[in-house]
């Protein structure tokens, strides 16, 4: 339990330690997933009973088939009653292969073969773990939790295993990086772009370029990723002093510094 609480505290600290220059509003699912995850973790720590504790064999009896006990699925060891979605999860439904088991891996890989319908996510990247918790958040929101699956993620007493703590550590790092990336997109929205064989390419800024709605247009700049040599076109606000300190920003060749559009010559 102590390790579990330490993991929870580490998760909160990781998200709160975003660099000051990236302290912008975070949009998308990241906040929703984080809040849902924290509520679930706190609930698990304080709950006196973990609900049903099912073995793999017991869970297999809830596949919606003949003589089935019900319609359950598990994701990251958490078991949900998906009876209200029988149209999709029951026999003949498009997601029936998820029922009666924990097929966490397939939610991300899309591999619905017998081998792919596994709960082994030990080789997942941080971004894949974040995406998987998006799915967990969906089931927590839309379906009824009924208990835990004994095995990879939960012990016979319903406590999280080291494997689950490892996954949650990856979630912590992944959420932090996603928050930083989304904050950077607010500070450096992507440019609009077009290309033609005849005239080459053009990049330009608008109040909606990069999908970021704002009250300023900006001017195009190349933003390089340190150590990679790769860049993307971003729109910057010249009046914002933070840009003058960023050595990874460069102007486009033969483009006036205050131009909202830059022509890119063909190679």
Curated annotation (Swiss-Prot):
Heme-binding protein which promotes neuronal but not astrocyte differentiation. It is found in: Secreted. Residues 1-17 form the signal peptide. SUPFAM superfamilies: Cytochrome b5-like heme/steroid binding domain (SSF55856). The keyword Cell membrane does not apply. Residues 53-150 form the Cytochrome b5 heme-binding domain. InterPro entries: Cyt_B5-like_heme/steroid-bd (IPR001199), Cyt_B5-like_heme/steroid_sf (IPR036400), MAPR/NEUFC/NENF-like (IPR050577). GO terms for cellular component: endomembrane system; extracellular region; membrane. PANTHER family: MEMBRANE-ASSOCIATED PROGESTERONE RECEPTOR COMPONENT-RELATED (PTHR10281), NEUFERRICIN (PTHR10281:SF4). Pfam families: Cyt-b5. It comes from Danio rerio. The gene is cyb5d2. Keywords: Neurogenesis, Secreted, Signal. The cytochrome b5 heme-binding domain was proven to bind heme, although it lacks the conserved iron-binding His residues at position 90 and 114. Belongs to the cytochrome b5 family. MAPR subfamily. This is Neuferricin. One of its GO terms (biological process) is nervous system development.
